[in-house]
Curated annotation (Swiss-Prot):
InterPro entries cross-referenced by the UniProt entry: Leu-rich_rpt (IPR001611), Leu-rich_rpt_typical-subtyp (IPR003591), LRR_dom_sf (IPR032675), LRRC69/RLP (IPR052595)
LRR repeat intervals: 47-69, 70-92, 94-115, 116-138, 139-161, 162-184, 186-207, 209-230, 231-253, 261-286
Record Pfam families: LRR_1, LRR_8
Keyword field: Leucine-rich repeat, Repeat
Name of the molecule in the record: Leucine-rich repeat-containing protein 30
Length: 300
Protein backbone atom coordinates (compact mmCIF):
# COMPACT_ATOMS: atom_id res chain seq x y z
CA UNK A 1 0.00 0.00 0.00
CA UNK A 2 2.79 2.39 0.95
CA UNK A 3 4.53 1.79 -2.36
CA UNK A 4 1.38 2.55 -4.36
CA UNK A 5 0.75 5.75 -2.43
CA UNK A 6 4.33 6.83 -2.98
CA UNK A 7 4.00 6.32 -6.76
CA UNK A 8 0.71 8.20 -6.87
CA UNK A 9 2.26 11.08 -4.98
CA UNK A 10 5.21 11.14 -7.39
CA UNK A 11 2.88 11.23 -10.40
CA UNK A 12 0.88 14.09 -8.90
CA UNK A 13 4.03 16.19 -8.80
CA UNK A 14 5.05 15.39 -12.38
CA UNK A 15 4.86 18.79 -14.15
CA UNK A 16 4.16 17.15 -17.53
CA UNK A 17 1.08 15.44 -16.15
CA UNK A 18 -0.07 18.56 -14.33
CA UNK A 19 -0.07 20.42 -17.64
CA UNK A 20 -2.74 18.02 -18.88
CA UNK A 21 -5.01 18.74 -15.92
CA UNK A 22 -6.93 16.00 -14.17
CA UNK A 23 -7.10 13.57 -17.06
CA UNK A 24 -6.84 10.08 -15.60
CA UNK A 25 -6.27 7.88 -18.62
CA UNK A 26 -3.55 8.33 -21.22
CA UNK A 27 -3.41 6.76 -24.67
CA UNK A 28 -0.22 5.05 -25.74
CA UNK A 29 0.80 7.97 -27.96
CA UNK A 30 0.14 10.49 -25.14
CA UNK A 31 2.39 8.53 -22.83
CA UNK A 32 5.07 8.24 -25.48
CA UNK A 33 5.19 12.00 -25.99
CA UNK A 34 5.07 12.69 -22.24
CA UNK A 35 8.06 10.43 -21.69
CA UNK A 36 9.96 11.97 -24.58
CA UNK A 37 10.08 8.75 -26.60
CA UNK A 38 10.36 8.58 -30.36
CA UNK A 39 6.77 8.21 -31.80
CA UNK A 40 8.20 5.70 -34.26
CA UNK A 41 8.31 3.25 -31.37
CA UNK A 42 4.50 3.01 -31.77
CA UNK A 43 4.74 1.66 -35.30
CA UNK A 44 3.75 -1.98 -35.70
CA UNK A 45 6.05 -3.81 -38.06
CA UNK A 46 4.32 -6.78 -39.63
CA UNK A 47 5.49 -9.23 -42.25
CA UNK A 48 4.21 -7.07 -45.10
CA UNK A 49 3.40 -3.59 -43.79
CA UNK A 50 4.37 -1.02 -41.21
CA UNK A 51 1.13 0.09 -39.57
CA UNK A 52 -0.09 2.76 -37.17
CA UNK A 53 -3.52 3.08 -35.58
CA UNK A 54 -5.36 5.82 -33.69
CA UNK A 55 -8.86 4.31 -33.75
CA UNK A 56 -11.65 5.71 -31.53
CA UNK A 57 -9.44 8.20 -29.69
CA UNK A 58 -12.03 11.00 -29.80
CA UNK A 59 -9.61 13.15 -31.79
CA UNK A 60 -10.77 16.33 -33.51
CA UNK A 61 -7.30 16.97 -34.94
CA UNK A 62 -4.51 14.70 -36.10
CA UNK A 63 -1.37 15.00 -33.93
CA UNK A 64 1.51 16.66 -35.78
CA UNK A 65 4.01 13.93 -34.97
CA UNK A 66 2.14 11.63 -37.35
CA UNK A 67 3.45 13.49 -40.40
CA UNK A 68 6.98 12.50 -39.44
CA UNK A 69 6.21 8.77 -39.53
CA UNK A 70 7.32 8.44 -43.13
CA UNK A 71 7.63 4.65 -42.92
CA UNK A 72 3.93 4.04 -42.27
CA UNK A 73 2.13 1.96 -44.92
CA UNK A 74 -1.17 1.21 -43.18
CA UNK A 75 -2.77 4.12 -41.33
CA UNK A 76 -6.04 3.76 -39.42
CA UNK A 77 -7.64 6.98 -38.13
CA UNK A 78 -11.20 5.66 -38.19
CA UNK A 79 -14.02 6.47 -35.77
CA UNK A 80 -12.79 9.77 -34.42
CA UNK A 81 -14.20 13.28 -34.84
CA UNK A 82 -11.80 14.60 -37.47
CA UNK A 83 -13.15 17.53 -39.46
CA UNK A 84 -10.07 18.20 -41.57
CA UNK A 85 -7.44 16.04 -43.21
CA UNK A 86 -4.42 18.38 -43.42
CA UNK A 87 -2.35 18.74 -46.61
CA UNK A 88 0.56 17.24 -44.65
CA UNK A 89 -0.95 13.83 -45.41
CA UNK A 90 0.88 14.13 -48.74
CA UNK A 91 4.15 13.49 -46.91
CA UNK A 92 3.20 9.89 -46.18
CA UNK A 93 4.05 8.67 -49.65
CA UNK A 94 4.45 5.03 -48.64
CA UNK A 95 0.85 4.60 -47.50
CA UNK A 96 -0.86 1.58 -49.05
CA UNK A 97 -4.01 1.47 -46.87
CA UNK A 98 -5.68 4.58 -45.42
CA UNK A 99 -8.77 4.24 -43.22
CA UNK A 100 -10.64 7.47 -42.47
CA UNK A 101 -14.14 6.07 -41.99
CA UNK A 102 -16.43 7.27 -39.22
CA UNK A 103 -15.20 10.87 -38.99
CA UNK A 104 -16.67 14.29 -39.86
CA UNK A 105 -14.65 15.10 -42.98
CA UNK A 106 -16.30 17.50 -45.43
CA UNK A 107 -13.46 17.57 -47.95
CA UNK A 108 -10.11 16.05 -48.85
CA UNK A 109 -6.94 18.02 -49.61
CA UNK A 110 -5.51 18.00 -53.12
CA UNK A 111 -2.34 16.58 -51.64
CA UNK A 112 -3.94 13.13 -51.60
CA UNK A 113 -2.65 12.97 -55.16
CA UNK A 114 0.85 12.50 -53.70
CA UNK A 115 -0.10 9.13 -52.21
CA UNK A 116 1.12 7.20 -55.21
CA UNK A 117 1.40 3.88 -53.34
CA UNK A 118 -2.20 4.01 -52.11
CA UNK A 119 -4.22 0.89 -52.92
CA UNK A 120 -7.07 0.94 -50.38
CA UNK A 121 -8.98 4.03 -49.21
CA UNK A 122 -11.90 3.95 -46.77
CA UNK A 123 -13.94 7.16 -46.55
CA UNK A 124 -17.22 5.65 -45.31
CA UNK A 125 -19.41 7.55 -42.87
CA UNK A 126 -18.15 11.08 -43.29
CA UNK A 127 -19.77 14.30 -44.54
CA UNK A 128 -18.22 14.48 -48.01
CA UNK A 129 -20.25 16.39 -50.60
CA UNK A 130 -17.48 16.07 -53.18
CA UNK A 131 -14.10 14.49 -53.70
CA UNK A 132 -11.17 16.21 -55.42
CA UNK A 133 -10.30 15.34 -59.00
CA UNK A 134 -6.73 14.93 -57.79
CA UNK A 135 -7.68 11.64 -56.14
CA UNK A 136 -7.74 10.15 -59.63
CA UNK A 137 -3.95 10.61 -59.72
CA UNK A 138 -3.65 7.75 -57.23
CA UNK A 139 -3.37 5.33 -60.13
CA UNK A 140 -2.62 2.28 -57.96
CA UNK A 141 -5.95 2.54 -56.13
CA UNK A 142 -7.77 -0.81 -56.10
CA UNK A 143 -10.41 -0.39 -53.38
CA UNK A 144 -12.38 2.82 -52.79
CA UNK A 145 -15.25 2.93 -50.31
CA UNK A 146 -17.25 6.16 -49.93
CA UNK A 147 -20.57 4.93 -48.57
CA UNK A 148 -22.68 7.00 -46.16
CA UNK A 149 -21.63 10.44 -47.36
CA UNK A 150 -23.41 13.28 -49.20
CA UNK A 151 -22.09 12.63 -52.71
CA UNK A 152 -24.13 13.21 -55.85
CA UNK A 153 -21.38 13.17 -58.48
CA UNK A 154 -17.80 12.12 -59.12
CA UNK A 155 -15.07 13.89 -61.10
CA UNK A 156 -14.85 12.73 -64.72
CA UNK A 157 -11.15 12.08 -64.13
CA UNK A 158 -12.06 9.06 -61.99
CA UNK A 159 -12.19 7.19 -65.28
CA UNK A 160 -8.38 7.15 -65.02
CA UNK A 161 -8.44 4.82 -62.00
CA UNK A 162 -7.77 1.90 -64.29
CA UNK A 163 -6.78 -0.52 -61.51
CA UNK A 164 -9.86 0.04 -59.37
CA UNK A 165 -11.57 -3.27 -58.57
CA UNK A 166 -14.01 -2.44 -55.78
CA UNK A 167 -16.13 0.71 -55.52
CA UNK A 168 -18.73 1.40 -52.84
CA UNK A 169 -20.97 4.44 -53.43
CA UNK A 170 -23.94 3.27 -51.36
CA UNK A 171 -26.00 5.52 -49.10
CA UNK A 172 -25.34 8.76 -50.96
CA UNK A 173 -27.40 11.06 -53.21
CA UNK A 174 -26.59 9.78 -56.71
CA UNK A 175 -29.47 10.18 -59.18
CA UNK A 176 -27.55 8.10 -61.74
CA UNK A 177 -24.39 6.03 -61.83
CA UNK A 178 -21.57 8.46 -62.76
CA UNK A 179 -20.39 8.02 -66.34
CA UNK A 180 -16.77 7.68 -65.24
CA UNK A 181 -17.66 4.42 -63.48
CA UNK A 182 -18.36 2.70 -66.80
CA UNK A 183 -14.73 3.25 -67.81
CA UNK A 184 -13.41 1.17 -64.91
CA UNK A 185 -12.81 -2.06 -66.82
CA UNK A 186 -11.24 -3.94 -63.89
CA UNK A 187 -14.20 -3.32 -61.58
CA UNK A 188 -15.51 -6.57 -60.07
CA UNK A 189 -17.56 -5.05 -57.21
CA UNK A 190 -19.95 -2.09 -57.46
CA UNK A 191 -22.33 -1.03 -54.68
CA UNK A 192 -24.75 1.80 -55.45
CA UNK A 193 -27.52 0.77 -53.07
CA UNK A 194 -29.60 3.31 -51.12
CA UNK A 195 -29.22 6.20 -53.53
CA UNK A 196 -31.73 7.97 -55.77
CA UNK A 197 -31.29 5.94 -58.95
CA UNK A 198 -34.27 5.70 -61.30
CA UNK A 199 -32.55 3.62 -63.96
CA UNK A 200 -29.38 1.76 -64.82
CA UNK A 201 -27.65 3.09 -67.92
CA UNK A 202 -27.10 0.83 -70.92
CA UNK A 203 -23.37 1.46 -70.41
CA UNK A 204 -23.43 -1.02 -67.53
CA UNK A 205 -22.54 -3.65 -70.14
CA UNK A 206 -19.07 -2.05 -70.36
CA UNK A 207 -18.21 -3.51 -66.95
CA UNK A 208 -17.32 -6.93 -68.30
CA UNK A 209 -15.42 -7.99 -65.16
CA UNK A 210 -18.24 -7.18 -62.74
CA UNK A 211 -19.06 -10.06 -60.38
CA UNK A 212 -21.05 -8.29 -57.67
CA UNK A 213 -23.52 -5.49 -58.46
CA UNK A 214 -25.71 -4.12 -55.69
CA UNK A 215 -28.36 -1.50 -56.51
CA UNK A 216 -30.93 -2.27 -53.83
CA UNK A 217 -33.19 0.34 -52.22
CA UNK A 218 -33.38 2.82 -55.07
CA UNK A 219 -36.23 3.91 -57.36
CA UNK A 220 -35.24 1.81 -60.37
CA UNK A 221 -38.21 1.25 -62.69
CA UNK A 222 -36.78 -1.18 -65.23
CA UNK A 223 -34.27 -4.01 -65.50
CA UNK A 224 -32.10 -3.08 -68.53
CA UNK A 225 -31.38 -5.75 -71.13
CA UNK A 226 -27.77 -4.55 -71.25
CA UNK A 227 -27.30 -5.83 -67.70
CA UNK A 228 -27.93 -9.33 -69.03
CA UNK A 229 -24.74 -8.99 -71.07
CA UNK A 230 -22.61 -8.74 -67.93
CA UNK A 231 -22.30 -12.52 -67.83
CA UNK A 232 -19.58 -12.48 -65.17
CA UNK A 233 -22.19 -11.52 -62.53
CA UNK A 234 -22.41 -13.88 -59.55
CA UNK A 235 -24.44 -11.62 -57.26
CA UNK A 236 -27.05 -9.16 -58.52
CA UNK A 237 -29.08 -7.34 -55.90
CA UNK A 238 -32.04 -5.26 -57.08
CA UNK A 239 -34.18 -5.67 -53.98
CA UNK A 240 -36.50 -2.86 -52.90
CA UNK A 241 -37.00 -1.07 -56.21
CA UNK A 242 -39.95 -0.44 -58.57
CA UNK A 243 -39.22 -3.13 -61.17
CA UNK A 244 -42.33 -4.67 -62.77
CA UNK A 245 -40.90 -6.79 -65.59
CA UNK A 246 -37.77 -8.82 -66.23
CA UNK A 247 -35.94 -9.02 -69.59
CA UNK A 248 -36.26 -12.24 -71.57
CA UNK A 249 -32.46 -12.35 -71.81
CA UNK A 250 -32.06 -12.70 -68.05
CA UNK A 251 -31.18 -16.39 -68.50
CA UNK A 252 -27.82 -15.28 -69.95
CA UNK A 253 -26.70 -14.56 -66.39
CA UNK A 254 -25.91 -18.21 -65.81
CA UNK A 255 -23.45 -17.60 -62.96
CA UNK A 256 -26.12 -16.26 -60.64
CA UNK A 257 -27.05 -19.83 -59.78
CA UNK A 258 -30.20 -19.24 -57.74
CA UNK A 259 -32.75 -16.82 -56.36
CA UNK A 260 -31.14 -15.43 -53.22
CA UNK A 261 -32.95 -14.29 -50.08
CA UNK A 262 -30.09 -13.78 -47.64
CA UNK A 263 -28.31 -10.46 -48.37
CA UNK A 264 -24.90 -12.14 -48.17
CA UNK A 265 -25.71 -14.94 -50.61
CA UNK A 266 -24.67 -15.00 -54.23
CA UNK A 267 -27.46 -15.17 -56.78
CA UNK A 268 -30.31 -12.98 -57.99
CA UNK A 269 -31.92 -10.73 -55.36
CA UNK A 270 -35.21 -9.39 -56.72
CA UNK A 271 -37.54 -9.32 -53.71
CA UNK A 272 -39.72 -6.36 -52.71
CA UNK A 273 -40.42 -5.26 -56.28
CA UNK A 274 -43.92 -4.90 -57.80
CA UNK A 275 -43.33 -7.69 -60.34
CA UNK A 276 -46.25 -8.34 -62.68
CA UNK A 277 -47.83 -11.80 -62.81
CA UNK A 278 -46.76 -14.55 -63.22
CA UNK A 279 -43.26 -13.40 -62.22
CA UNK A 280 -43.75 -13.47 -58.42
CA UNK A 281 -44.78 -17.14 -58.52
CA UNK A 282 -41.90 -18.00 -60.85
CA UNK A 283 -39.40 -16.29 -58.57
CA UNK A 284 -40.77 -18.31 -55.67
CA UNK A 285 -40.23 -21.44 -57.76
CA UNK A 286 -36.53 -20.75 -58.18
CA UNK A 287 -34.15 -19.49 -60.82
CA UNK A 288 -34.41 -22.52 -63.10
CA UNK A 289 -38.18 -22.13 -63.38
CA UNK A 290 -37.86 -18.40 -63.99
CA UNK A 291 -35.20 -18.83 -66.68
CA UNK A 292 -37.20 -21.55 -68.42
CA UNK A 293 -40.24 -19.27 -68.60
CA UNK A 294 -38.22 -16.34 -69.97
CA UNK A 295 -36.51 -18.54 -72.60
CA UNK A 296 -39.85 -19.88 -73.84
CA UNK A 297 -41.28 -16.39 -73.88
CA UNK A 298 -38.38 -15.13 -75.97
CA UNK A 299 -38.54 -17.91 -78.56
CA UNK A 300 -42.32 -18.09 -78.91
Amino acid sequence: MGTKQSRASSNDKDPKRLLLGKRQKFSSWDDTLLLGKDPRSLLKRGMRHVSFSLVTKGMTDIPDFLWGLLEVQKLNLSHNQLRVLPPEVGRLTRIVVLNLCGNCLKSLPREVSLLQSLKVLFLNMNCLAEVPAELSLCRNLEVLSMSHNCLSQLPASFADLSRLRKLNLSNNYFAHIPLCVFSLKELDFLHVGSNRLKNIAESIQCLASLQIFIAESNNIHSFPRSLCLVTSLELLNLNNNDIQTLPDELYLLCRLGRIAWNPMDKGLHISHNPLSKPLPELVEGGLEMLYSYLKDKKHN
